[in-house]
């Protein structure tokens, strides 16, 4: 029996030395130490031995078992280390190979224009205010003197989330929120995305950018409005630009006007950009309607103000010679890399 145990140990040791993977090691473990393994069978036959042999053979069998278990663990670790080394060697990065350049984005003409607009107004003392794009009907319409039966509330112009919530159709609600939260004097612009229920084509988009402004203080007049817009136009389009105002109607301003500037592409001579007219419509503007001031808790007998707004996308398209507004929202790198 003693010789048999020594033979099992030597045989298992030789097999472990030639094992090449975890599968081989597991097969060796089962062969010798499993439920039907050779060493296990000897241990189960201990009862047939004499009382003198049993402790001697039992001790030797346990020593062989412990030795085999230790050798199996040692062989498993060697196999594991070898596999790890092989894997790491296969994953080594050849630093001598040329790298692949990461694809990055590019400056967008809308944001290039918006940054310029914001910087001009900051220099003029305006602060930038922001507000939610999902807006209450109350702020988007009602407090801006747009009653329930106004055509602008129709589904053909407005995206309704429910009866009381819309996707804002203008950034004017930011002006309302500012007047509710701040006391005059107020001098702010509110740039941002707005939404209209328009079918997308070369000149229309259901989403576009607006920049609106508001000034409220004592003694504000239409002359202040004209001076502000003229100053902006000269800084934006050049000192030689000229402006003209045409009477118009907006429910939230009274009096109201639309403002045109001489075409910055042809200097007013007439070209493709201005469609031969020499002028480009830029602003909608006017003096803040007394009802709007009252709705925001501002006494129109004490304070007055003016408001203005322009479509930023239109300026971007005219400035860069873009003839399809959809290009501004497609994120095509071939297009964006031109700017």
From Swiss-Prot:
Pfam families listed in its UniProt record: Phe_tRNA-synt_N, tRNA-synt_2d
Cofactor(s) the protein requires to work: Mg(2+)
Coiled coil segments of this chain: none
GO cellular component, one term: cytoplasm
GO biological process: phenylalanyl-tRNA aminoacylation
Subcellular location: Cytoplasm
Protein EC: 6.1.1.20
UniProt keyword annotations, A-Z: Aminoacyl-tRNA synthetase, ATP-binding, Cytoplasm, Ligase, Magnesium, Metal-binding, Nucleotide-binding, Protein biosynthesis
InterPro entries according to UniProt: aa-tRNA-synth_II, aa-tRNA-synth_II/BPL/LPL, Phe-tRNA-synth_IIc_asu, Phe-tRNA_ligase_II_N, Phe_tRNA_ligase_alpha1_bac, Phenylalanyl-tRNA_Synthase, tRNA-bd_arm
Catalysis: reaction(s): tRNA(Phe) + L-phenylalanine + ATP = L-phenylalanyl-tRNA(Phe) + AMP + diphosphate + H(+)
Cofactor binding description: Binds 2 magnesium ions per tetramer.
Positions that bind Mg(2+): 254
Molecular function (Gene Ontology), one example: transferase activity
Subunit structure as annotated in this protein's UniProt entry: Tetramer of two alpha and two beta subunits.
Family of this protein: Belongs to the class-II aminoacyl-tRNA synthetase family. Phe-tRNA synthetase alpha subunit type 1 subfamily.
Protein's UniProt name: Phenylalanine--tRNA ligase alpha subunit
């Amino acid at each position: 029996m003693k010789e048999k145990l020594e033979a099992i140990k030597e045989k298992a040791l030789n097999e472990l030395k030639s094992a090449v993977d975890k599968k081989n090691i597991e097969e060796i473990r089962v062969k010798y130490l499993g439920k039907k393994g050779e060493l296990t069978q000897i241990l189960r036959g201990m009862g047939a031995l004499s009382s003198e042999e049993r402790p001697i053979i039992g001790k030797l069998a346990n020593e062989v078992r412990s030795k085999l278990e230790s050798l199996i663990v040692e062989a498993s670790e060697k196999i594991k280390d070898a596999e790890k080394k092989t894997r790491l060697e296969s994953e080594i990065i050849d630093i001598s190979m040329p790298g692949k350049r990461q694809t990055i984005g590019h400056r967008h003409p809308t944001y290039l224009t918006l940054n310029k607009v914001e910087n001009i107004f900051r220099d003029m003392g305006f602060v930038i205010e922001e507000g939610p794009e999902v807006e209450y009907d109350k702020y988007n319409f009602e407090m801006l003197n747009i009653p329930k039966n106004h055509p602008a509330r129709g589904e053909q112009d407005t995206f309704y989330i429910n009866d009381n919530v819309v996707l804002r159709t203008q950034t004017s609600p930011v002006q309302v929120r500012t007047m509710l939260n701040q006391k005059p004097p107020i001098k702010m612009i509110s740039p941002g995305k707005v939404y209209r229920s328009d079918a997308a084509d070369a000149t229309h988009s259901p989403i576009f950018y607006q920049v609106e402004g508001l000034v409220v203080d004592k003694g504000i007049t239409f002359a202040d409005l004209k001076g502000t817009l003229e100053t902006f136009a000269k800084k934006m389009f050049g000192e030689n630009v000229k402006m003209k105002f045409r009477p118009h109607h907006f429910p939230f301003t009274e009096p109201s006007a639309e403002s045109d500037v001489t075409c910055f592409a042809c200097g007013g001579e007439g070209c493709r950009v201005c469609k031969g007219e020499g002028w480009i419509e830029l602003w909608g503007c006017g003096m803040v309607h007394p009802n709007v001031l009252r709705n925001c808790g501002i006494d129109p007998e004490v304070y007055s103000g003016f408001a203005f707004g322009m479509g930023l996308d239109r300026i971007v398209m005219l400035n860069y010679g873009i003839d399809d507004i959809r290009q501004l929202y497609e994120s095509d790198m071939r297009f964006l890399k031109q700017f």
